[in-house]
Amino acid sequence: MEEQITNNIPDGMGVTTEPAAESIAEPVAESIAVPAAESVAESLPEGQSAADGAGTHVGLSDDGLVLRAEGLVKRYGKRTVVNDVAFDVKQGEIVGLLGPNGAGKTTSFYMTSGLVVPNGGHIYLGKEEITKLPVYKRARLGIGYLPQEASVFRKMSVEDNILSVLEMTGKPRDYQLEKLESLIREFSLQKVRKNLGDRLSGGERRRCEIARCLAIEPKFIMLDEPFAGVDPIAVEEIQEVVWHLKYRNIGILITDHNVQETLAITDRAYLLFEGRILFQGTPEELAADPIVRKNYLTDKFVLRKNSFQDRPAPVEG
């Protein structure tokens, strides 16, 4: 796992100088295989959204639970790679963490996921501080994590991959089988449901991984480079899958080097530059900002949206 993390962090930010293993008490795979706990939101008072003021950590917006990072700091040796970074994700929205190589976006994402322990700052789910919780404990609170690397069980069929997680929910068998069929249909996996994990295309694998993650009914999903290793023809397919998750009232945090594909589906985005937040706003605001274009997007960048975003919201079931 440490090797995987090292491969995903930009040059000069390797975790070997300060291993992230201290934050991972259990395999990352458990983040998609542990039933979510009772809703944190049910026991929390009404709170403020991120826009209500910096420094607060009351974690409910008007629309639901908020996953919030405040003042994150990460140092490797004498080098500070993340310095006072703050962002939030509400249920039912898609938020992007963007930036050039070495900007600190991946490290910030890993601190929020539970893969890297910050040297400073706090992470909250609602009013509960989760800064030092490993991935599998965050999963029990309703935070799913999908790594860039393939996480399907390679020698299990698609339906068994999904069912293996459903079986851990403790729900009745009839419910498990009904939920399995619902997820198979929703993610158009009917034709490959009997295929082994190692026989899936990049797009099929991603759909299987997201379907399996939904088996635990998460409140938030962390997507690490969701468009990596996916054929160009399947990119819009994955975008549409992620886009529709917001209609389940799931908050999505994405980090990806494919800025065009990411901005096409995000509601808001944070741009990191040299370890700090340079800009935050809607994709349209980000694409129009001259400083952002100069330091990151270039003048030739054109923001594109997808046709599926104009369709009616899907009906679950």
Where are these regions (language model features)?
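Conserved ABC ATPase signature
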Residues: 196-200, 204
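Conserved ABC ATPase "signature" region
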Residues: 174-192, 239-243
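Helix-to-loop junction immediately C-terminal to a conserved catalytic motif
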Residues: 113
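ABC ATPase NBD coupling module
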Residues: 129-149, 173-177, 283-291
